[in-house]
């Protein structure tokens, strides 16, 4: 990455296929990486990040993302399995997933059976999302967003599986269209 805050960080893009990410996706991913491994303020600056790209509404997947059995290589279930195969110890998913597919359930179960921790965002829909996001499955650590005073952010979702919180703002992140913080 070219973000100055990540200079010297151990980050490897392990995406199994071509994903063209929007500026918003790049900014979000870089901000999450910086919160983890930035040398000045990351919570685990010596950690190694294996990065896997999901496809969001403004992103596009390459033709090499077609997978087997109808599961594309850039889908959450496939990426979780790839991370397991790559030796991940903690899987942090800073997005929500309302699909709730059987392959996703089994990928999460496989991670849990191998002692791999999965933490996932509760979502940004400002409602109870107990039945529709990653944390609906036992063992996934659901994370809601709070402000610097410990109050849930107005936009953040919550639910039965939410057992943790992380500061969701105000946080300065790099704007990749301008390069500014």
Say what each PLM segment does.
Residues 48, 115-117, 141:
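Proline-centered loop/turn at the N-terminus of a beta-strand
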Residues 12-16, 141-144:
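Short hydrophobic/aromatic-enriched beta-strand-loop microsegments
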Residues 58-135:
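Substrate-binding/access-modulating region of protease and related hydrolase catalytic domains
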Residues 1-2, 17-18, 41, 55-59, ...:
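Solvent-exposed loop/turn segments at secondary-structure junctions
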Residues 1-12, 20-71, 100, 138, ...:
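Subtilisin-like serine protease catalytic core
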Residues 132-181:
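Extracellular S/T/G-rich loop segment that most often corresponds to the catalytic His/Ser-adjacent loop
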Residues 42-44, 84-85, 111-113, 134-137, ...:
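Extracellular/periplasmic catalytic domains that process cell-envelope and extracellular macromolecules
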Residues 17-24, 177-181:
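Short pre-catalytic strand/loop immediately N-terminal to key active-site residues, enriched for Gly-Thr
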